[in-house]
Amino acid sequence: MTDKEKRLERQSRIRNFSIIAHIDHGKSTLADRILEKTSAITQREMKEQLLDSMDLERERGITIKLNSVQLKYKAKDGEEYIFHLIDTPGHVDFTYEVSRSLAACEGAILVVDAAQGIEAQTLANVYLALDNDLEILPVINKIDLPSAEPERVRQEVEDVIGLDASDAVLASAKAGIGIEDILEQIVEKVPAPAGDPEAPLKALIFDSLYDAYRGVVAYIRVVEGTVKPGQKIKMMATGKEFEVIEVGVFTPKAQPADELTVGDVGYLTAAIKNVGDTRVGDTITSAVKPAAEALPGYRKLNPMVYCGLYPIDTAKYNDLREALEKLELNDSSLQYEAETSQALGFGFRCGFLGMLHMEIIQERIEREFKIDLITTAPSVIYDVYMTDGEKIIVDNPSNMPDPQKIERVEEPYVKATMMVPNDYVGAVMELCQGKRGNFIDMQYLDANRVSIVYEMPLAEIVYEFFDQLKSSTKGYASFDYELIGYKPSKLVKMDIMLNGEKIDALSFIVHRDYAYERGKVIVEKLKELIPRQHFEVPIQAAIGQKIVARSTIKAMRKNVLAKCYGGDISRKRKLLEKQKEGKRRMKQVGSVEVPQEAFMAVLKMDDSPKK
């Protein structure tokens, strides 16, 4: 057999697939069982959620970064097949990670919980898989639960998604039921990769990570051609060239190989120093004989949510910078730049894909780098059109220009899809209306579940919307959103003043109709949280020059009349006047300490105005 025939023969036995599911439907457990069944790992190495390697992932039980692994499986027809399993995150913030990993596959196993049925993110991920023309194999998981209703769920898969679920595998990943049927279905139904091993190299980067010794390690799926050590390669998006040092596959552990050819999923190292050079979704080609065009699907990720991160101990500013640099190496979607605040000192303005992404980065900084952080209120990006025709992009409320010069402000809107049990439709619609949502569509999925679609401003979803949605449906709702563009809104910037001074870190942008209520609530909250001083402190909420709400923290005062028993009124008055004069002088020079809870109070605006 020639080299080409060998490669083509091997190619016909490759199956690339990923597992997609809603959070908690048992995706990582199924991956564990498949690894066990194909004996990729010994019993000794087996631990729960084997592919979730980050501590945080194991702790929260979610998948954040994607992982891939090569498995060998001897099928019933006697052939040995090579499987590449690519594990994907299920959370809405990491949709791009899902779409990239799906682009590296030919098939997807759709895991649906036999008790819960289809959820919003199941749908979102299925649509991504269909966009990538993948063969979808439905698997109904957790059939050993007492509340499982596999037949109802099978019907739901057919009705809601439109997939033929007549031969869906009934399985329980935890108990190890049905795993072999799943593997046999992969062999039969998932197509082998197409592509010419002799053509110019085309490989998709679907992830990258930074290794202190080898530089950047790119995770790739070879679509055409062959790549081997010593070859010169070129990145098509950035145009940078490198020489390949090592290629290999994961059998969860990295294992060097002689070459990677069509259909292989593995890793590649070349002396790449900067993660920015291996953009996820980019195409690698040969520098000598480059491919004519790149693979589709690459796009630069733009952050959706911004917030300020400040070290509580200002001496740790440089440590925070190093922490962000290291995290950025592994996370191409994190963006940051230095900023200063009069109230909080030096820190960074960081951009994230969404709220979960933001929480995870904060937690990793506090945990892995031991830096205590203060975070400011998250905000989205506003487009501000000025009266002189200029357009300004504002990601920090304190940069909002003077209201007199603004013609209009546009904010990002999202299309939010919620899957809700029937009984809670009213509560959810009320919540969405209160968040300035516009009703778009409502469909009954079956007798007791409804899908509701709203258009809403991203700014309203950013903070605590998901928590409120969960609490108004007793935890049963699921939720997914996609950006649909910018729309004009009546937005104003509200400043909070303490003792007549603006506190920049407490400024926020709010819709004009809600400004008065929002201002009133915050002023009252701050009054409770800021400790009393020796002089009285007015707290004011202002829009431009206009004060919309005010509250006063009363001064602590000593009883100066204690030693005047009875006594003449003029004597008492003299002592009181003297005390008053002292307080007045103090008020001119005194400054107010704002505790961290006060910043958090502005964020936790859960009592949003009811319409």
From Swiss-Prot:
Annotated binding of GTP, by residue: D24, H25, G26, K27, S28, T29, N141, K142, I143, D144
Subcellular location as annotated: Cell membrane
SMART domains hit by this protein: EFG_C
Sample GO molecular function, one term: translation elongation factor activity
Record family assignment: Belongs to the TRAFAC class translation factor GTPase superfamily. Classic translation factor GTPase family. LepA subfamily.
Physiological role: Required for accurate and efficient protein synthesis under certain stress conditions. May act as a fidelity factor of the translation reaction, by catalyzing a one-codon backward translocation of tRNAs on improperly translocated ribosomes. Back-translocation proceeds from a post-translocation (POST) complex to a pre-translocation (PRE) complex, thus giving elongation factor G a second chance to translocate the tRNAs correctly. Binds to ribosomes in a GTP-dependent manner.
Name this polypeptide is given: Elongation factor 4
Organism encoding this protein: Bacillus velezensis (strain DSM 23117 / BGSC 10A6 / LMG 26770 / FZB42) (Bacillus amyloliquefaciens subsp. plantarum)
Gene: lepA
